[in-house]
């Protein structure tokens, strides 16, 4: 009887280990699938955005600064708004700051390694100063560790003004550069919209799938919840920006690659913190002036 029990116990243990290993394997498989989804989502978004820009007669840089950057910032928006609604102010602001640090320090760096990025004059004269200005504005308004509803409204109004200026900016006749000349139009403008919409959906779903499975793998490896949050979740919400900018660089679309990063950093502060602050005034001592100074410096 004892032998039968030991055999049964051994059988159960063996199958438990087998199932555990299968579970690990499935998480790795889903992680790889999420990367594939991110790649093709970015491919569709960049293709649709570039074609739409050429069809509308506007610079792909403007598309990168608006449609692409706003779309790829959706994960940060969802996380920060949920955090604000739950009274988790530190998470709401930390998510935005962490994403902005990641965008410039990692995404722009990797994109430049993939393909040397050409910086347009508009970026240096308008968009980069706006990005630095929004970082400085956040630093000043957050010196008291609070973002009131009035201050949040100021963020949103500044963003609206910036977007309106971008879209109604005089379309000066210019020499078409090599990058824009190589852009291929899709068969119809509706396909551009479809590519952009499906690309954004794939990016949001792919980044969520990546975070979930990467977190499970990290837990099995013994990583703490705090460490997972500071690394995997923070990087995970920036996966759409990373995938889009890297694919844009591979396709030699410097304007979209850079515009996506600069636009996302502007959008993260002005819109995400603006909306989160309107829903629930933000107050936390966990984010200090050094974080704000670092944001200005890296911008």
What residues fall within each predicted segment?
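Hydrophobic alpha-helical segments, chiefly the membrane-spanning helices
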Residues: 7-8, 13-299
């Amino acid at each position: 009887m004892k032998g039968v029990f030991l055999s049964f116990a051994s059988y159960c243990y063996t199958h438990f280990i087998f199932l555990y290993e299968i579970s690990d394997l499935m998480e790795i498989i889903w992680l790889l699938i999420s990367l594939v989804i991110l790649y093709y989502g970015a491919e569709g978004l960049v293709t649709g955005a570039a074609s739409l820009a050429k069809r509308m007669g506007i610079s792909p840089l403007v598309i990168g600064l608006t449609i692409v950057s706003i779309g790829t910032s959706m994960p940060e928006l969802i996380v920060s708004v949920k955090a604000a609604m739950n009274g988790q102010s530190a998470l709401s602001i930390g998510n935005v700051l962490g994403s902005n640090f990641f965008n410039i320090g990692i995404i722009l760096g990797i994109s430049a390694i993939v393909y040397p990025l050409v910086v347009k004059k508009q970026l240096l004269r308008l968009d980069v100063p706006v990005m630095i200005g929004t970082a400085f504005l956040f630093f000043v308004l957050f010196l008291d560790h609070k973002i009131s509803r009035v201050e949040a409204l100021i963020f949103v109004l500044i963003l609206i003004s910036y977007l309106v200026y971008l879209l109604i900016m005089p379309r000066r006749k210019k020499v078409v550069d090599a990058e824009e000349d190589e852009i291929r139009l899709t068969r119809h403008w509706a396909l551009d919209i479809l590519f952009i919409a499906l690309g954004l959906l794939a990016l949001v779903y792919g980044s969520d799938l990546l975070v979930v499975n990467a977190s499970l793998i990290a837990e099995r490896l013994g990583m703490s919840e705090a460490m997972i949050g500071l690394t995997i979740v923070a990087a995970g919400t920036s996966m759409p920006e990373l995938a889009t900018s890297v694919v844009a660089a591979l396709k030699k679309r410097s304007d979209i690659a850079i515009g996506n990063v600069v636009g996302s950093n502007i959008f993260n502060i002005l819109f995400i913190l603006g909306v989160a602050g309107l829903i629930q005034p933000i107050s936390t001592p966990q984010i200090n002036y050094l974080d704000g100074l670092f944001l200005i410096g890296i911008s």
